[in-house]
């Protein structure tokens, strides 16, 4: 699986066991992601932070 880094022009290949890509946003500003990468389990959203997870190459 390949996941985009913070700047989508760059990406990395995920290590074994991390088979989801994610994008993290601040709830107050959903237009600008603050973090992207590989993850094993999609975190729950909170009052401040929203996560979007997916499982295809560079989907984040």
Swiss-Prot record:
GO terms for molecular function: toxin activity. Disulfide bonds join 3-21, 14-38, 42-53, 54-59. It comes from the Eukaryota. Coiled coil: none annotated. One of its GO terms (biological process) is killing of cells of another organism. InterPro entries: Cytotoxin_Cobra, Snake_3FTx, Snake_toxin-like_sf, Snake_toxin_con_site, Toxin_cobra-type. Expressed by the venom gland. It is found in: Secreted; Target cell membrane. Keywords: Cardiotoxin, Cytolysis, Disulfide bond, Membrane, Secreted, Target cell membrane, Target membrane, Toxin. GO terms for cellular component: extracellular region; membrane; other organism cell membrane. Signal peptide: none annotated. Shows cytolytic activity on many different cells by forming pore in lipid membranes. In vivo, increases heart rate or kills the animal by cardiac arrest. In addition, it binds to heparin with high affinity, interacts with Kv channel-interacting protein 1 (KCNIP1) in a calcium-independent manner, and binds to integrin alpha-V/beta-3 (ITGAV/ITGB3) with moderate affinity. Preferentially binds acidic phospholipids like phosphatidylserine, phosphatidic acid and phosphatidyl glycerol. Monomer in solution; Homodimer and oligomer in the presence of negatively charged lipids forming a pore with a size ranging between 20 and 30 Angstroms. Belongs to the three-finger toxin family. Short-chain subfamily. Type IA cytotoxin sub-subfamily. This is Cytotoxin 7.
